[in-house]
Structures are given as structure tokens and as C-alpha cells.
């Protein structure tokens, strides 16, 4: 009966598509990016050839100079104001000359990816908007314009309702992970076992409030995680953003049988009442708890932005602070848990994940968790038509206890500490672990020229200096102290890039 019902439904959908085809309005848009990068010391290695391989960073090995391209194509099928469907493809990133991604001579690489695919519809006789499918989901942020907890594409059902011009409501259910570990698994010759609980489900509610000169959005999010979500064969895999951001990095003997519950809450907003003066803030809290308490993670992150818009540009001051690990590895981590921060951080486009195009970025990490910082910027400075410049200077440091540095090393299973290294399996390390004795300085200049309405040329240059404390109270007792002293005492990374983009922005 179920099969017959399925066939009937499919036939009805096909018939509807056939009879209503003339009423569908198809709209296409896209983005073409050509990028040319040159940089050195992406892993902060010194200049000696033996310790420096191109622009290695975050486990990626790149040449000092590389040319890259990416194409994004979006197709919208609009039946009415109440019903539409969208599919969004991405081709790339393709490194010129790289056969694995279709950039070598002859091309013909199989490198087309599905980025988003969803339908939008409205509940009849109401203003309730529903989006179902793989879509972009982001928690709110008024300072960085990119959530440090969740900002990425994910399979979800989202609801949006506007009560009046001042009050709205947004809710979603998202499933970032499921069925990645398999239903039957055998590890190291042991007896095969079944594994059904490898999913992660997130539920969130946001309440956007907008008044004259003031916007505030309080929000909450809960996530349930199955014990099979962190299976051993997924360590360091491409989907492992959650394993880096949701665990402490330490674990005991029952880590693979630990159900998890996570909770986040935040208040973000801005005041533009005294325009052109603007104040923006983000306050976020999060915790992730497991049956294995060593895996727990709990912390908060707050940021503040002050800026004043002038005719020629917008100068601004900003700062942030995030809790870091204390000196006890057995009580979990005091860093705020994160799911995937894949947005464009306005505070930094080199140290963190902030560049809107293809670029070398997140050299310190994809999020600001476990760090503090202050910065100044001149944004969108323009003295010539269609030419803009943005200058950033950031000074930052870590908030993790110096004692924790000795755990950033390899690990012998089930040693007397009963904990794994903070970098175990790629967990909890994104990618540089900064203590309260470690500091970094970033200087960046971004130049954009709008040559035509849909064609922009960008020239971007950035420099990052890192100082790690190699005394015995911090990294000197680390098992890798010789390695860190050679590579991080102190050193710098830098890049320069030129990019061209033609688009209706996707």
C-alpha cells in the first residue's frame, strides 16, 4: 500500500509539473571567481627550506603561489509568491594545474557539488513562511556579521513569521550529521556491532525585535547527539567541524558510548539611534555535556563594535573575549562549543575565517573561541568612485591556561592521566591553541574596485605575527617543545592576493 501511495504521489507531482509548466518563472544567477594568491609561512615555519613547505596551513599543503577558480550557479523556479524552488551548484575550488579537481591540462574533472537545494512555500491564509531542504542557516551576529557557533549550509526545515513591523519569529530544525558511521561496523578485528545513533539534531528559536534605532535578537538552540557521531574512522574527516568544536579534546574509556546534549543562548543587537554612530554587540553562551564528563565543553564569547560613518569611510573600534580552558584537563573544556563557523568574519579575513571570496584565511582558526582581542579598522574608505579600501589592525591573545600547553601532543591510549591530548584525533584544535602567554598581531588591507556593475577586482594583503611562550611554564614542557621552538619562536605568516569576481552574488 505504501508503494502504491508513493507511486500515486509521484504521478500527481509529474502531472502537476506538466500542466503548470507555463506558469513557472525560471531565474538564474551566478558567481565566477578567479583568484591568484601568493604567501609564505602559513604554518608560521621559519624560512629554512627544511621547515617550510610553500604555504602549508591547517593540514593543507599549498605552493607559495597558486591560481584558483570557483563557479556558483543558482536556479530559482518561481510558481507564485507562495511557492518556489531553488537549486544551487558549486564548481570548485579548482586549483589551476591540479588534476584531482579538474584544473590540469584537458580539464574534464568531476567536480560539481550541490551547495543548496530547497523549496519555499507559505501556509495558506497565513504569513508563515516555510523553507525545506539543504539551505544556509546562520545564528545572528551584529558585530562580526558571522556567527561563531553556526553559519553554514545544512539540511533543515526553517519557519519564519512576522507578527508586526517590530516583532518576528524564526525557528528551525536542522540535521547536520546522520548515517555517516554505518549501521554495521567492525573495528580492529572485534565482533561487528550495529550503530544507529550517529545523528545530530538541532532545534532553535530566534526572536528578532526591531524598533526605531534599535535592533535586538535573543535566541536559544538545543542539540541532541548520538554516541556514534564521533566514530573513530571519522577523526579528521572533512565533516569533522563538530568533532573539533563540540568536544573538549579529552576523553576517557567510554567516549564512544556517550550521548550528548548541547545548549546555546545569546543576545545580539545594534543601536543606530544616534546615526551615524553605531554600537553593536554579541553575547553568546554554550555548553555540551556527555556521559563521559572529560568530553564536556562550556564557555561564552562576547564582542563589541563601535563605529562612526563619515562621508569618506567608516572608522571603528572593536574587541572580543572568549573563555578558555582552566588548568584541569579532567573537568572538560571551558571553551564555548561550536558547530560550524563558515561565515565571513568582519573582524579579520586572515587570522580567522573572514574573506568573502576564495582566499587563504583562518590561519589561527575558524572561530574566535579561546581567544581575546582588540582591533581598529577603517572600513570602505573611498576617495575615488567605485574604489574602496579597508584597513584592519588586530592584537589578540589566548585565554587557555598555560599548563594546558603540555597536553598538545601525541597520546598513549589510556595513560595514567585518563585523558587524551587536546589535539587528539583533530578534536578541539582549530588549529592553533593559544594560552594566556601567547599573542598575535594582524595587519590587513583590502582594496576593491567595481569595474562594472557585475565585475569587481580585489587586491588583498595581510600579515600575521605570532609569539608563543617557550618557557617551561608553557610550551617548554610540551612533548613537542623542540618542534614548537623551531617553528613558533616567534614567526610570521603573510599573503597577498588578487582576485576578480563576476556575479550576481550567490
Regions found by a protein language model. Give the residues of each.
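A conserved hydrophobic secondary-structure block that centers on an alpha-helix together
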Residues: 142-144
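Beta-barrel outer-membrane channel/assembly domains of diderm bacteria
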Residues: 2-137, 157-171, 198, 205-214, ...
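Glycine- and aromatic-enriched membrane alpha-helices
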Residues: 349-350
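Outer-membrane beta-barrel translocator/channel fold
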Residues: 175-191, 196, 214, 219-236, ...
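Long, well-ordered mid-to-C-terminal structural blocks that present hydrophobic/aromatic surfaces
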Residues: 294-342
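Active-site-adjacent helical/loop segments in soluble small-molecule enzymes
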Residues: 354
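Long, hydrophobic, well-ordered secondary-structure blocks that form the structural core
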Residues: 148-151
